[in-house]
Amino acid sequence: MAQRRKITAIVGLEQYNAGLWRKIKSMLDKDAELVQLSDVDLEKQNPEAATAIREADCVFMSMINFKEQIDWFKEQLDQAINEKTIFIFESMPEAMALTKVGSYQVTEGKSGMPDMVKKIAKMLVKGRDEDALYGYMKLMKIMRTILPLVPNKAKDFKNWLMVYSYWLQPTPENIVNMFRLILREYFDSNVKVEPIVDVPNMGLYHPDAKEYFKDVKSFKSWSKKRGVNFDKSQKMALLFFRKHLLQEKTYIDNTIRTLEKHGVNVFPAFVMGVEGHVLVRDWLMKEKIDLLVNMMGFGLVGGPAGSTKPGTAADARHEILTGLDVPYMVAQPLLVQDFESWHELGVSPMQVTFTYSIPEMDGATAPVILGALQDGKVETVQERLDRLAILSKKWMRLRATSNRDKRVALVVYDYPPGLGKKATAALLDVPTTLLRILERLKKEGYNVGTLPESPTKLFEMLDRATDYQIMQNKPEAIKVSREKYNELATYHERERIEERWQAFPGEIAPVGSEEVFLGGLRLGNIYIGVQPRLGVQGDPMRLIFDKANTPHHQYISFYRWISREFDAHALVHVGMHGSVEWMPGLQTGLTGECWPDALLGEVPHFYIYPVNNPSESTIAKRRGLATMVSHVVPPLARAGLYKELPALKDLLADYRERNQAQGEDVEQVQEAIMTKAELLNLTDDCPRRPDEPFSDFVSRLYIYIVELENRLISNSLHVFGEAGPLESQIITITETIKNRGENGRSLPYIFIDTSGRNGHYGSYEEISSLSRKGDEAAIQLREWAENACREFVKQTMFDRKNPMQVFESVTGGGRMPEEDKPFIQRIIQEGAMMIQALSDNSSEMNSLVKVLDGGYIPSGPGGDLVRDGMNVLPSGRNIHSIDPWRIPSETAFKRGTLIADGLISKHVAENDGQYPETIAEVIWGLDTIKTKGEAVAVVIRLMGAEPAYDAFGKISHYNLTPLDKLGRPRVDVLMQLSPIFRDAFGILMDQLDRLVKDAAKADEPHEMNFIKKHVDEALAEGMDFEAATSRQFTQAPGAYGTYVDDMIEDSAWENEGDLDDLFIRRNSSAYGGGRKGEKQSEILQKLLGSVDRVVHQVDSTEFGISDIDHYFSSSGSLQLAARRRNTKTSDIKLNYVESFTSDIKLDEADKSLRVEYRSKLLNPKWFEGMLKHGHSGAGEISNRVTYMLGWDAVTKSVDDWVYKKTAETYALDPEMRERLATLNPQAIKNIVGRMLEAHGRGMWKADQSMIEELQEIYADLEDRLEGMADDD
């Protein structure tokens, strides 16, 4: 009797197919023992899986693409005692290389197909690179017909190909016969092998049809007999996997039937996965479909297999989806998660990658999760299917409705209310933007009524129409009655809301006891509304987004009124950002119980968003179902000098040029310098050190003033669709070009080197670093190089002069080096492209019009304009994030290494040679995307590790660097993550967690491994290993924000203990590895007690640390928490790293803040630029004053002179005060109020006379505001 063979099949992403494999096992039971494993078994390194692999006679593997899993699999093979036959398909090269079929093996790094086969496959698709994988599939069928002609010496390759052919037709019967073929050919089993039963590689399907349709024509003909004429109606296409159709098609049938029940005509199309784009391009393009829904996830081009060449997929998808020009959605069930996991945690990191991250690069929008696993089978949720159907109908309605009949809702913000923030958004002039949008819509044929003559008038109209105090009893005001409210909200929703906010209408905007006020401005078919506040001002604990929280009655009424009463065809949120997408619910994979989905799931949603924030835009896309329309950031400018600063700079320059004022007047000049420096409070910024020569002090003070003068600032706001001034474009492009480099040579360094000025400097970064330290030669060289770069950019790119001649001119006769010519030519080309994109910004408004027509706008990466250049241009695209598997990038790791080494060197120099034991680092999702992972690289380097790459170029894990190579101890790192990082980078968190655990397990002494030291201490105190190795903390799942900023803005705190307690409560959820946000307050506070330094990166020029509240509420609060728990010292330094320009700056928070206040808040160039934007600009000034108080609350780092100068600039100057009161009375009231609050809390020691004057001004402003309300 023949030996019973053991076959182990390992198939990735196959958890949904338990029923299929049970059937296959049963059918094969007489022939062999079959064990079926999944990628999860490899990931968890299950002992049962190890045994099955070692004991198998044959191993069959497919869809395994993680190096760690392959490495473990190979370990099991190496421990086996028997020879194995190994078939591996559709997996990473490291896996494919393990194939062993008789004498046939796959060469490492190859895909398994001989080169000749690849060439033939490419011929079959007419040389299209993007169709190469599809060509292989076509070739497979052709080759099967000629296999009998293959000579016996190629028998093993023939068998390998035949086995793959069976696998590509994955019915249970074909899979059983595949295994029987293996048994017959390699184990002499006497089994009968049936021929392959073929199914078309792609086609159309309907659950009511008896057979598959091999083309569109036959499907349309069949449909016509059923009364559906696809040529005379709107229709959508549904793409799904052929494999699922053959094996587990219930969810496909349910989706098709639900769509048809809602009256949607569907082209249900199946593909193997690699040829989805082929079907769209060759079959659907000519059918003029109105919507494309991809149920497969992954990329449209190449599917799970990706593309054959870098850039090929991007080019092909752009061509196809732009040509198709319809909305593109992804909707699919969870194939690797059960319902319990989904409803508790949202979508797993693995599924996030192919459901969200990859499709977003194609421009996919409005993702809907349709179901999950139950007992090894995909089960759909009817409510989710209905959501897909409703959205599909609304998208198609948007396309079908004429512009004159379309109703569009434009939503702006006012948070927190009462502070002059109505109709403001980050970086955007909202009133002017609104008017420009209305003017363009009018040209496009929309009914916009009678437009106001100016942005100011439009704001006045909107302000009055949304003012609760003025309008609540006006008959023309928009309100919702109790009866209507009961129609708009379901009984279950009302029950949840009433438990939180009491009975309708609640305490927010009630009109009597039977109505709630919405307000808003109607202009023809356009509605402009102000998003309701989150909760009750002054009580931030009511605002916390825990899972039990809900929107209040006015909030749900507002969005339901827009979607159902106003019956909007489209909803547009204007600017970054509102609150609705941050409402309670799952992080991803939202259900109808999640408030963002409940509020936004009934109307096509568009979001005008700055191109520099792809991380927060991801929340709007994934939770808010939004299509992003990006806009550029405001123009950049140099801060310049003002008031007495230019005179001091001249005095310092004169001192330096006269060789340190040698002669009789030396003491007088020195006294004049010190007097002016003290008058300007510059001795706080740049104090003279003990025993420091005066000439050295002058050099440091001079370079500090030059830094202030040349600091990049945004001193205006962007108007959607408009271009910035020429000078700003020159500055932006110059900074971008300076960031570029090749072979260690940047443009500034090439100029210096070619001009003969280099001397002993090895790089421009070295020159910049030395100049900041006061090195006289480096100062002069840096100034010369900066001017040379600017002139080169202006003359070659803007004036279009000959680059060779300009190069010679700026270098004083130097010739452009031959080896640098290709690099210089490339940056000139990039600069020219940037000029085109920045000078003609019409793409923004054109894209908005396009999406309102129901069309497709291209996707594009978001990021920093200076750092990324043309990569983020043109604006007006549907911005997306980055590939989490390639973080940090090689460049980011190099720069992160420099930052980490600089931090350690700085600490050692300041602490008598002692290394830091723990550094707390804030890591934001936005920073990670913009810098491609510099902050992550800092963590890796501090811990003494480096990335390990697989054959695809993905980072599989981080390897510990040997201590003898590292040359210092491993530093422990407490990572304070943003919730967006938590949502977007689950894979990265797992990799960082493994690094911590590897370091904790390393056989190294405590004095050389502080991670191990701290973990061992925690274990000795009774913590388990998971708790002891927790290093990544942020808010609980589904929660966003520390709320320290809200507590400060609402003045709802008494002392720093209140702020600290809130920070700890909100930020003690641990992540990474198996952690899913469990509270780990004990280890967090223990780690905080060991923190020696806090570090945070500033990722771009648009937002400095004084410009937004996130900095003080995260890294500022983190420093506060460390300071209150560290028993060794309270002097915990907070460092900010600026790496967005060509050199890296590392400064303490107090210095960074002084630079910010001097270059912006107190700088006429900045505030006059803001005031040109009227109401919005005044609101921006007011925000900065609130944030200043926030900084002082958590760090005590705002000097009295800053408060005094702020009061003198804005409140005590009658002319300025009146300007602000005219533009935005609530803004100036907030400015004065914050001054008084700072004094009242003891933060600002001011003269009593100044306080009394401010009190009088505040009372007068209050009276004026009350009088304005009374006038109405």
Swiss-Prot record:
It is an enzyme of class 6 (ligase). The keyword Transmembrane does not apply. Keywords: ATP-binding, Bacteriochlorophyll biosynthesis, Chlorophyll biosynthesis, Ligase, Nucleotide-binding, Photosynthesis. GO terms for molecular function: ATP binding; magnesium chelatase activity. It catalyses: protoporphyrin IX + Mg(2+) + ATP + H2O = Mg-protoporphyrin IX + ADP + phosphate + 3 H(+). Its EC number is 6.6.1.1. Pathway: Porphyrin-containing compound metabolism; bacteriochlorophyll biosynthesis (light-independent). GO terms for biological process: light-independent bacteriochlorophyll biosynthetic process; photosynthesis. Signal peptide: none annotated. Involved in bacteriochlorophyll pigment biosynthesis; introduces a magnesium ion into protoporphyrin IX to yield Mg-protoroporphyrin IX. NCBIfam families: BchH. PANTHER family: MAGNESIUM-CHELATASE SUBUNIT CHLH, CHLOROPLASTIC. Belongs to the Mg-chelatase subunit H family. This is Magnesium-chelatase subunit H. It comes from Chlorobaculum parvum (strain DSM 263 / NCIMB 8327).
